[in-house]
């Protein structure tokens, strides 16, 4: 995955996950770095996208539906439906807008979003859901009468939650 995690876009880089979906640890990361540093530029082969697909180097995958199904299966969706929640979402210009909105709409929540436009520069702001970055969501929740506000960082692995009073 290419991400700056919850940092400004200038920190974008490659994030490596293990087969189990966890972050690569220091030893695994060092092994990867050592392997890459041993590659000589003249050894790097170039292929077109079509050649890469045909040769099996590139595999197109579409994991979103399976990801959403797993989340929906692990959450008490009926309890959320019964609550009749009005939810404000702030994906902070990152990648969570489609997934979080789909989950909440499946739970029959009323959903509105701010900062939903995908922007690799995160609107020039720090894409981290923390007290210093949630003012817009806090104001939106209180002014529009939402029950809850949910913010995610740029790559959607951190969350911030605002109650109906803006806390």
List each language-model region with its residue ranges.
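Gly/Ser/Thr-enriched, mixed-charge loops and adjacent short helices
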Residues: 12-144
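Glycine-rich phosphate-binding loop
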Residues: 1-11, 140-164
